[in-house]
Curated annotation (Swiss-Prot):
<keyword id="KW-0963">Cytoplasm</keyword>
<dbReference type="InterPro" id="IPR029052">
    <property type="entry name" value="Metallo-depent_PP-like"/>
</dbReference>
<dbReference type="InterPro" id="IPR000979">
    <property type="entry name" value="Phosphodiesterase_MJ0936/Vps29"/>
</dbReference>
<protein>
    <recommendedName>
        <fullName>Vacuolar protein sorting-associated protein 29</fullName>
    </recommendedName>
</protein>
<comment type="function">
    <text>Component of the commander complex that is essential for endosomal recycling of transmembrane cargos; the commander complex is composed of the CCC subcomplex and the retriever subcomplex. Component of the retriever complex, which is a heterotrimeric complex related to retromer cargo-selective complex (CSC) and essential for retromer-independent retrieval and recycling of numerous cargos. Component of the retromer cargo-selective complex (CSC).</text>
</comment>
<comment type="subunit">
    <text>Component of the commander complex consisting of the CCC subcomplex and the retriever subcomplex. Component of the heterotrimeric retriever complex formed by vps26c, vps29 and vps35l; within the complex interacts with vps35l. Component of the heterotrimeric retromer cargo-selective complex (CSC), also described as vacuolar protein sorting subcomplex (VPS), formed by vps26 (vps26a or vps26b), vps29 and vps35. The CSC has a highly elongated structure with vps26 and vps29 binding independently at opposite distal ends of vps35 as central platform.</text>
</comment>
<keyword id="KW-0472">Membrane</keyword>
<keyword id="KW-0862">Zinc</keyword>
<keyword id="KW-0653">Protein transport</keyword>
<keyword id="KW-0813">Transport</keyword>
<dbReference type="GO" id="GO:0006886">
    <property type="term" value="P:intracellular protein transport"/>
</dbReference>
<keyword id="KW-0967">Endosome</keyword>
<dbReference type="GO" id="GO:0046872">
    <property type="term" value="F:metal ion binding"/>
</dbReference>
<dbReference type="Pfam" id="PF12850">
    <property type="entry name" value="Metallophos_2"/>
</dbReference>
<dbReference type="GO" id="GO:0030904">
    <property type="term" value="C:retromer complex"/>
</dbReference>
<dbReference type="GO" id="GO:0042147">
    <property type="term" value="P:retrograde transport, endosome to Golgi"/>
</dbReference>
<dbReference type="GO" id="GO:0005829">
    <property type="term" value="C:cytosol"/>
</dbReference>
C-alpha cells in the first residue's frame, strides 16, 4: 500500500508550483493514500492532491486558507496508527521531546509532522517519526535554501519502507529507510 506524505507547499505565496520532476513522479492511480502536513494554502493545491489519490488526509498549517482542516488527525493504514500534525504546535520547532509527547498522546506508531520544511525520518523508542519537508522547497522564517522533498511510504504488514525523494540541483535523489513495528 503506497502512502504519499508531503506538506508545506506554500503555493502561490512562496512558490509557484511543485517541481516539474516531482509532478512526473506523482501520477494518478499509483498511490492509495495521501497524508499532508498542511500549508497547501489554496483549494487548487487540495484539488491537485485529489487527482493523485481518493483518500486524502490534511491537517491545518499556519498558512492554510481552509480553517476546516483539523489541527491533528489519526489515520490507520494497514497495521499502523499514524498521527498527522502540522508541527507549528511543537516548540521549539522539531523538538524531539515535544514530538515524543505528541506521539504518546495520540497513541500512534508513526508521527508525521511538518513546519520546519526540512526532511527528517528517524526511530525513537520503537516509534517512527517523519517530517516530509517542503514539497516545493518553500523557504521558512529561519532558512532560505530548502531542498524540495516528499516521502512515499510502502506499507506491507508490520514493515514500512520509507522512500524520501529530494530534488538536489537538477537530480531527484531517493533514499530508503525501513521501520519494523515491534
Amino acid at each position: 500500500m503506497l502512502v504519499l506524505v508531503l506538506g508545506d507547499l506554500h503555493i502561490p505565496h512562496r512558490c509557484n508550483s511543485l517541481p516539474a520532476k516531482f509532478k512526473k513522479l506523482l501520477v494518478p492511480g499509483k498511490i492509495q493514500h495521501i497524508l499532508c502536513t498542511g500549508n497547501l494554502c489554496t483549494k487548487e493545491s487540495f484539488d491537485y492532491l485529489k487527482t493523485l489519490a481518493g483518500d486524502v488526509h490534511i491537517v491545518r498549517g499556519d498558512f492554510d486558507e481552509n480553517l476546516n482542516y483539523p489541527e491533528q488527525k489519526v489515520v490507520t493504514v494497514g497495521q499502523f496508527k499514524i498521527g498527522l500534525i502540522h508541527g507549528h504546535q511543537v516548540i521549539p520547532w522539531g523538538d524531539m521531546a515535544s514530538l515524543a509527547l505528541l506521539q504518546r498522546q495520540l497513541d500512534v506508531d508513526i508521527l508525521i509532522s511538518g513546519h520546519t520544511q526540512k526532511f527528517e525520518a528517524f526511530e525513537h523508542e520503537n516509534k517512527f517519526y517523519i517530517n516530509p519537508g517542503s514539497a516545493t522547497g518553500a523557504y521558512n522564517a529561519l532558512e532560505n535554501n530548502i531542498i524540495p522533498s516528499f516521502v512515499l511510504m510502502d506499507i506491507q504488514a508490520s514493515t514500512v519502507v520509507t522512500y524520501v525523494y529530494q530534488l538536489i540541483g537538477d537530480d531527484v535523489k531517493v533514499e530508503r529507510i525501513e521501520y519494523k513495528k515491534s
